[in-house]
Amino acid sequence: MKAIILLSLLATLVPLLGQTEKTTPEKPAKPAESDKQALLPNQQAFLNLPEEQRKNFIKAIEEANRLFQQKRIFETLAELEKAYKIFTDSPEIYNLRGSCFIEMRSFEKALSDFKKAAELSKDNPSIEFNIGEVYFVTKEWQKSLDMFEKVIKLVPENNMALGRLVEFKILLCKKKLGKKEDAIILSEKYDFLDDSPYYYYAKAAMAYDENNLIKAEEWLAIAGRIFNDPNVLAPWQDTLVEYGYIKSFYGEESTEE
């Protein structure tokens, strides 16, 4: 079974906890009327909970994230269940639970939870990315392309790492859909001066398409020397695995269409 590290990292590095404060004053000031209007209904509902329940909820979510980072999936689910019993309308719960299902390769359940998270946190790039990624690993290329083209418009300009990765996935989706000219243009969008692995992985992808495996491996080796942090390259490498270019570390080959 192939692991999808990217979704795991995304769920933990962007946990969406910004929607609620981690600490609550003993005597919180009454929110201004404009602040109330800016809150989503589920956010306001959370703030209406007793302080002790809010603290317990946040404690459970933080513990779930900690356990998830350690790949302790069933313990993560147990903590999420604690949080769910306190407050059900939380995108954090569904986003992280969906990521747990991804680790278990239960894609239908993952997609269902990610969609629930998206309903509660509109236009959140990390959640929308997760939906696109489920379509990507299940080979639903048009749906994946549609989602990633939406995500690229939502990613903040200062989040280049995610933005470049999304563009790479768009490139690969277009290749699968027969849009070769678009894919070629995207493969040449950045050069070696770019501060991401995009250039090298795009070159490798094009080499794989030409059945030039040696050249593809050379490009990946160069990327490995330049970006020597495994955490940086992991989502790019996993993308090639899920796309079908290379074998996973589990010895399985992705199914080509």
Question: What residues fall within each predicted segment?
Answer:
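Start-of-helix register in tetratricopeptide repeats
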Residues: 58, 92, 126, 165, ...
